[in-house]
Amino acid sequence: MNLKIRIIGAGLAGCEAAWQCARRGLDVELYEMRPVKSTPAHQTSDFAELVCSNSLKSAGENSAPWLLKEEMRRGGSLLLEIAQKTSVPAGHALAVDRGAFAAEVTRVIEAEPRIRVVRGEVTKIDENDALTVIATGPLTSDALSQEIARLSGNTHLYFYDSISPIVEADSIDMSRVYMAARYDKGTADYINCPMNKEEYDRFLDALIEAHSVDAKEWENLNYFEGCLPIEEIARRGRDTLRFGPMKPVGLTDPKTGRYPYAVVQLRQENLRADSYNLVGFQNHLKYGDQARVMRLIPGLENAKFLRYGQIHRNTYINSPTLLTETLRMKEHPNVFFAGQISGVEGYVESIATGQMAGMHVSTVAMGHEPVAPPRATAFGSLVNYICHAEAKHFQPANITFDLLPQLDEAARRKVRDKKERHRMVCEAALKEFDGWLATSQIFQ
């Protein structure tokens, strides 16, 4: 048995993987380069710092993100438990106070006696020495990226991701906005900034004319479609934003009794409710232009920005050529990958792959062969995608029903209602997941 386990990266995936190993009685070395060396996007030395949104997506029952979180919960996810404890109001979504979340993850991980935290940059990987989980995330350092390229035999793939601005709550003119949840589902947790056509056109023109941050390396940018900067969306057509992040449907303005022409939504950032982020407003405009354009939004005329939108490069491996369905390298079986560097996109997906990698590496450490989760589960569908997608055009993916197996033809003919179909898919997935957990993860 090889009981020596190293986990590189104390982000979402790395912390979850370390916890899964520790709860199975295994000793872990967890490496984190911050604060010795930071990244362009991180602001603290805390583990599991959320650098983009503070949302862990839908908590609505029988949605694909809900299914993935339910499997994680049944599998004993630490970070999901902490997310629930540090949640902030966000309608049908699970959003967290990002500071409280990262602080609590750090506290719990550092207090676990089986986890030894090592602060400093890892630049070399000995694939024959120890069982290793690489969970360094999309902002992996250059030196370690070169080492991963050596292991993988090829260069990394990448896309560009961007971050939304955050404003002080006290700087929002509440007389010009209203609280609501879309279609009045759940509690009215979002601040909604309504626009008429004239206001929208003025905002759009200013957005298109604004200047982006200059950087030679950002020529011919390759964006992740699920997180496009708003200026890129705007260039695709004058109404594109109104059918995207500024979609007004389901958000009745109490002053008019109608849907606005367009809406900007603000989501609470922390438990103190002293700051809000602009939902879906990731961008990489110059700060001066960004402030000028965002202050054209009704209610934000005097907004004070705690953080401006920005862009950063996200690195990931070509998983279909490199990994098995247990997140293990085909050519180097002592090495596992987890998190966004493995080719998933999203906080929850990163935690889930960390959870799986922790389970699998623990099984190997105890002298057994790991068993991949069933294809019918959200876990299984996620790893099926990253391991079997077309390698030539591989891009990171979120969990969606498109990744999960569809009902058979007879069931589809019998059940026409989309919500009922989704419920049936979730029910089947959880049944398969429970069976897999009971029979294959024997070292819980």
UniProtKB/Swiss-Prot annotation:
Top enzyme category: transferase
The reaction(s) this protein catalyses: uridine(54) in tRNA + (6R)-5,10-methylene-5,6,7,8-tetrahydrofolate + NADH + H(+) = 5-methyluridine(54) in tRNA + (6S)-5,6,7,8-tetrahydrofolate + NAD(+); uridine(54) in tRNA + (6R)-5,10-methylene-5,6,7,8-tetrahydrofolate + NADPH + H(+) = 5-methyluridine(54) in tRNA + (6S)-5,6,7,8-tetrahydrofolate + NADP(+)
Residues that coordinate or bind FAD: 9-14
Compartments where located: Cytoplasm
Keywords assigned: Cytoplasm, FAD, Flavoprotein, Methyltransferase, NAD, NADP, Transferase, tRNA processing
A GO term for molecular function: flavin adenine dinucleotide binding
A cellular-component GO term for this protein: cytosol
Database matches in HAMAP family: TrmFO (MF_01037)
Described function: Catalyzes the folate-dependent formation of 5-methyl-uridine at position 54 (M-5-U54) in all tRNAs.
NCBIfam families referenced in this protein's UniProt entry, alphabetically: gid_trmFO (TIGR00137), PRK05335.1 (NF003739)
Protein name as annotated: Methylenetetrahydrofolate--tRNA-(uracil-5-)-methyltransferase TrmFO
Gene source species: Koribacter versatilis (strain Ellin345)
Phylogenetic lineage: Bacteria, Pseudomonadati, Acidobacteriota, Terriglobia, Terriglobales
Gene: trmFO
